[in-house]
Amino acid sequence: MSRLRPPVSDADHRAGPDDAPVTLLEYGDYECPHCGRAYPIVREVQRRMGRRLRLVFRNFPLAEMHPHAEHAAEAAEAAGVQGKFWEMHDAIFEHQAALTDADLIRYARSLGLDESRVKDELATGVHAARVREDFRSGVRSGVNGTPTFFINGTRYDGSWDLGTLLEALEGAPEDAGKRGQVRNLGTVVHE
């Protein structure tokens, strides 16, 4: 089984408590139809597990197949800088068929983000390095398609239908990778 490299850190986008016993990390592509189908399942897993789950998302845009995936990831990162990563993440997946730059700017506007800042950051590629860093970490972790999930730092290769995924999460040993993790107390965690 593949291990997550690097482990979850304060640099990651996390939803749920950092001390949750289970961490589900997804390497995803905003334009991938499989990720689009996994999105509501992951949301339901979050709802059912509540504070027992920490969700982490890392970008893994498959640009050669999905021409809008990289800019969608950069838009989510731009929203993250303004404190609304998860809101943009949700908006993108909920409107997966509409991912042009104009669409992404429209989502930014609807979320109350600084629209001109997002537009400038997309045009200049300010967040491209972060997206590439996530992608490289996925390659190091053995990711070769999306979505790819890790449960408590170990690659999960089972089915990601709701029942099977919940069963795997409920049966996961506590996340040993969190012990000794350095925390940045200024980090805001979306719950």
Residue ranges and their predicted role:
Residues 15-17, 25, 48, 142:
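Generic structural signal for beta-strand residues in well-ordered domains
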Residues 3-5, 26-28, 34-44, 105-191:
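C-terminal cap of thioredoxin/glutaredoxin-like
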Residues 18-20, 51, 145:
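Residue-level preference for short coil/turn positions at secondary-structure junctions
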Residues 5-22:
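A short beta-strand-turn-helix
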Residues 25-109, 114, 179-190:
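Structural alpha/beta surface segment adjacent to cysteine/selenocysteine redox centers
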Residues 14-15, 99, 122, 156:
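Short clusters of hydrophobic/aromatic residues that line enzyme substrate/ligand-binding pockets
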